Amino acid sequence: MSYRFHHMMKVCAEQAFAALPEQTRRAYHGRYGAWYAAHGQYLHALAAYRKGEDYDAVLQVIQDDAGILLAALSPEEVLAFLDACPRDTLQAHPLTLLVLMRRMFTWQQIPKMLELRALLLAGIEAHPELPDAERDNLLGECDLIMSFLQYNDIAAMSRLHRSAAARMTRPAISIRNEGSWTFGSPSVLMMFHRTPGQLGAELDAMNACMPHYYRLTNGHGQGAEQIMDAEAALLQGRFADAAIFLECARATIAGNGQENMALCCDFLERRLALCVDTAAPEPPAHKRAALLAQHDTMWLRIFDSACAYCAALTGQTEQIPALFRDHALHTVHLLAPCRPMMEMIENQVYLAEGACARVIGRSEGLLAQCAQQHYALVALQVRIQTSAAYAALGKRPEARSLLGQALRAAAPDGLLLPFAENGRGLRPLLELSLIHI
């Protein structure tokens, strides 16, 4: 009954507000937006300013938040705002343009990203009075953002990072170290293992390039190279090395507030604990409760994906978090770079549930995504999963063919763990497949 009265009062208040003069409504929306922004509630601030059509205020909030919470909105909402926002207003906010360029990349809205870059460069060109230092900072930060178009070619990205570092005299404004570095992926290695047979070179490149990136971004993603080293060691069966690299990464990121990188460590620790006798990881319920208190849905999804993967491997399907157990990934906003990883983990859940035909049916589209983003490790794992699914359905020729492809891709880098993790389903095939490599 109390809810009904509350709803009636809310409707009455909304009707009374709608009857106010337009200028008065805009003034109130501006006051709401200012209060929310002052208290760090940027999504509410954006909503209020948009209702009041205060485009300058919206753009300032996006800059203040560095676009972190834009991930909670749909691309369509943000694109509609950009279409409505006057060009001159956009051009007056060059730092916001940089933030928006990065967000367009994560949504794979590349034409819009390039359109915003052109607007930024035109704005810089139109203001010759701009101090040289600020001009160089804007152009350098533009190089930094454009490096994402070379994702996940580590060397190509690093060339643009070094170009940016040569220009910039301040840290980047458009990237905050509390924001997600992995775009929501639970694994660094899944993001950056690009070419079978080149894992060693990729690890060397990551160790060489990250210090330049850290200097530009106040340490955003700190520990990424150590996590990637640890993951590579884990997949190669070098468990002691994996544990050492993991603890080095944890020491690096301790106390720096980068929950994203800590969650990648957590995923690695949980996989390692399935292989060797180590201290038990923190119980999922405890960790999840701590994450809930942070009110960040991306962190929760990363953690849920790690728990779902490990529970699926061990057949503990009742322990799989609801997002994956209910196969509800399609209901949430995922950034494009992390989608193949999340879909691969959902595949592992389907396999644990015995939905083998579903795994096979999904594999072609998922492998196409992996090819588009050069995700060699995710593709390897999808082929292994699909091979196990074919084997479970008695389709041995198809299973052996896919397993052979996976073994040929994994052998040059000595990647063993993905096969071991699916050992129950692959064991009858492995001996025959090894003969035919």
Outline where the language-model segments fall.
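Alpha-helical repeat scaffolds
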Residues: 78-84, 111-122, 156-169, 199-212, ...
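Conserved small/polar residues in nucleotide/adenosyl-binding loops
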Residues: 435-437
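Internal alpha-solenoid helical repeat scaffolds
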Residues: 88-264
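Short, well-ordered secondary-structure microsegments
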Residues: 39-101, 105, 418-433
